[in-house]
Amino acid sequence: MAMKRRDIILEVSLQLFNDEGEANLSAVDIANELDISPGNLYYHFKGKEEIVAALYGQFESGVVALLDDIRDAGDTLEEHWLHLYVLLEHLYHYRFFFRNTTDLLQKYSAIEKRFRRMLEQQYQSIRTMLGQLLNEQHVAGKELDYVLIDELADNMMLIYTHWFEFQNLRKRALSQHPFIQSAIFQIMTLLMPYMGDQQREFAAECNLLYLRDKQP
């Protein structure tokens, strides 16, 4: 089935925003890329602000569904690793939202509250996940300071929200898979002090994959 013009506009806009940055593009640039007139673009979207809002709606819907999956996941590190990987895939697909995020939210006030609410939902889901993982470790007999859950969740959120910009600042243009592997590796290093032997074995396997992919 042929894509609707509106969907094509959103798909092309997303690609442009991801590749060149939202701030560097105008509605006319998008129209030129689509080889349509600005008037034709205006028929579907009354400017770039509506395009950004529509893309955010897609992004938000996907995140909410994935967070539900994370909350419903089991207690094992393997299950949570898979859900985190899929979530990072989704964030990567809409990565322009994480390039100069503060400036973008100031520019598009219509999505600011929704974005901050979505981040809080991510934080709570990650905190729930950590509680499940640490609870499992506690059953294994190790003493844990559960106050650290908040700090661990904060640090994981820092990776989620700033890993894109951090890689850009270091001029590392990573494709999707290496980017996600590097982010997962950082998250694993945060969790390693709280892992049991079985969890460490799985983490070591994941890290070997990361190091293999990292090699030129």
Question: Language-model segments: which ranges?
Answer:
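C-terminal peripheral helix-coil segments that are non-catalytic and often amphipathic
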Residues: E165-P216
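N-terminal positioning helix adjacent to the helix-turn-helix/winged-helix DNA-binding module
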Residues: R5, I9-V12, L152
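Short, hydrophobic secondary-structure boundary micro-motifs
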Residues: R99-T101, R114, K142-E143, L169, ...
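Short, basic, alpha-helical segments at the C-terminal edge of helix-turn-helix-like DNA-binding modules
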Residues: G57-V63
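Helix-turn-helix
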Residues: I8, L16, E20-E50, A54
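Amphipathic alpha-helical packing segments from all-alpha helical-bundle domains
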Residues: I111-H138, V147-E165, S182-P193
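Amphipathic alpha-helical segments used for helix-helix packing
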Residues: Y92-K113, M129-L134
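Hydrophobic alpha-helical connector segments
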Residues: D68-F96, R117
